[in-house]
């Protein structure tokens, strides 16, 4: 179901060294030094996210690395991400609809839809490509819930903006591109569903 159609029908979303040599020529401990920190088998490194984002956003992705590093420095390395598109617009009260695919390393991929009201000044009826970083997701179906937070321009760099939403220790960080005049942060939520729906509540 096309995002713009849903929007219209709805009325117009983170080297430990091993040790010093012992005194008088005693051999060092047998335990080897730990390797440098890197992504675990189930999480994505910053470089993996940036590469996926460059392919997705294209020419406007020059500022993506800065936003990804900001997100990783605060929440660590995500164990999933969503690529999709959305539309929305608000002047005091508005709606947001989107659809895309949730990607994970070891739990498969899953189609997702999202919708939700926004309350505040986020004016412009924007249409946006959206990448969402997903943290602490225990299983793919756990994405289907409401995530509340500050759904607006928490960080804006160039043609991209980043926000954050959370529920039950799961954090979703949307990174959006698109058109529309954003006049400030608005408060709302995004509800992820298995199927497209007109109802954002």
Residue ranges of model-derived segments:
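Bacterial N-terminal signal peptides that target proteins for export
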Residues: 1-14
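Sec/Tat signal peptide C-region and signal peptidase I cleavage site
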Residues: 19-23
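Small-residue-enriched, tightly packed secondary-structure blocks
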Residues: 28-201
């Amino acid at each position: 179901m096309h995002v713009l159609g849903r929007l219209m029908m709805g009325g117009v979303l983170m080297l430990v060294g091993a040790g010093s040599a012992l005194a008088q020529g005693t051999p060092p401990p047998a335990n080897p030094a730990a390797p440098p920190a890197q992504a675990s088998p189930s999480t994505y490194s910053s470089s993996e996210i940036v590469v996926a984002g460059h392919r997705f956003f294209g020419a406007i992705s020059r500022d993506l690395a800065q936003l990804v590093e900001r997100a990783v420095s605060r929440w660590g390395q995500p164990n999933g991400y969503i690529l999709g598109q959305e539309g929305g617009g608000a002047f005091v009260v508005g709606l947001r609809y989107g659809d895309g695919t949730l990607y994970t390393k070891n739990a498969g991929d899953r189609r997702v839809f999202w919708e939700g009201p926004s309350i505040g000044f986020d004016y412009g009826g924007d249409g946006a490509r959206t990448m969402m970083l997903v943290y602490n997701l225990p299983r793919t179906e756990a994405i289907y819930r409401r995530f509340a937070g500050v759904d607006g321009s928490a960080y804006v760099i160039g043609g991209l903006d980043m926000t954050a939403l959370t529920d039950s220790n799961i954090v979703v960080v949307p990174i959006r591109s698109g058109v529309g005049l954003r006049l400030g942060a608005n408060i709302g939520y995004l509800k992820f569903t298995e199927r497209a729906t007109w109802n954002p509540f």
